[in-house]
A protein has these predicted regions:
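Long, highly charged, low-complexity intrinsically disordered interaction regions
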Residues: 1-99
Length: 99
């Protein structure tokens, strides 16, 4: 999975949390990490393999766990659960149907 695809997933999560009126700090964390991932020069999967996720700006412990899950399985249970709460058209991610 490319960094761009991962970034879009985290952007989608932020957007869905915003619609749900979730904690604004949580929303901002997902937005920040989405931007950080989009700007990375190295693949997220490489950072996961090398144990270097702390180098991603905005990637706290919960987000690092999600990145590890995504890199390992190509799926993210939290994202899938959120998507189930919204009509398919809410998602802007081109990989949303693939997950």
């Amino acid at each position: 999975m490319t960094n761009q695809e991962i970034s879009l997933i985290f952007s989608d999560i932020a957007a869905m949390l915003r619609v749900k009126k979730d904690n604004i700090f949580k929303i901002r964390a997902y937005e920040k990490v989405a931007r950080s991932i989009a700007e990375l020069k190295e693949p997220v999967e490489k950072l996961v393999a090398e144990g270097r996720l702390k180098e991603i700006p905005g990637a706290g412990e919960a987000i690092r766990k999600k990145l590890t899950e995504l890199a390992a399985s190509g799926r993210l249970a939290f994202y899938e659960k959120l998507k189930a709460e919204f009509p398919e058209k809410q998602s802007s991610s081109p990989v949303s149907g693939a997950l």
